[in-house]
Amino acid sequence: MIAVVSVALLALAQPKPHAIGVDCVVSAISAPDRASLVANALDGRAQGFDALISAVRICGRDQWNAEQQGTMAGAAMSIFLRDDSAGKLTAVGVPTREIDRWFSEQHAEFQTNTEVTDAEATRLIDRLHGQGFAMELLDANGTAIGTYLGALIILRRVEQGLPID
């Protein structure tokens, strides 16, 4: 019985395979390349992704298929975008823990749905406003809030083994 429990605990303690891959990709990209990737993504430019592609290839060691490569690239980008938007929000006094708390309270379908409706986004903004954040501050930082929320959704999809497209 103890052996079974020990094996079960060890299995639970092991990082999920996707987490190992994402960690590898994230750590393989330099801070300047991360900044460039984020800037290009936020500006809608589909360029400058060489560092990301290279990191995915190195970390995948030619063992990831195209879908897995896309998942690792998308997860890494989501981490970069989440961290960038978290920094921006924190700098203006909007703690991301409030967004995290709101997100965790949403049903599982919402947490993995890449199409956030205006009504759902309004619920988040109203919640933050109700916690004392000025509507002007929230409006001025709507892009960072939306980017942060979008990154949480993509990362939840990856965590659950769902495609990110």
Feature roles, as predicted:
Residues 44-164:
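Mature extracellular/secreted ectodomains of secretory-pathway proteins
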Residues 1-12:
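Sec-dependent N-terminal signal peptides
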Residues 14-50, 54:
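Immediate post-signal-peptide N-terminus of mature secreted/exported proteins
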Residues 7, 29-30, 64:
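Residue-level marker of positions within ordered structural domains that often coincide
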Residues 12-16, 164-165:
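Compositionally biased, proline/threonine/alanine/serine-rich low-complexity intrinsically disordered stretches
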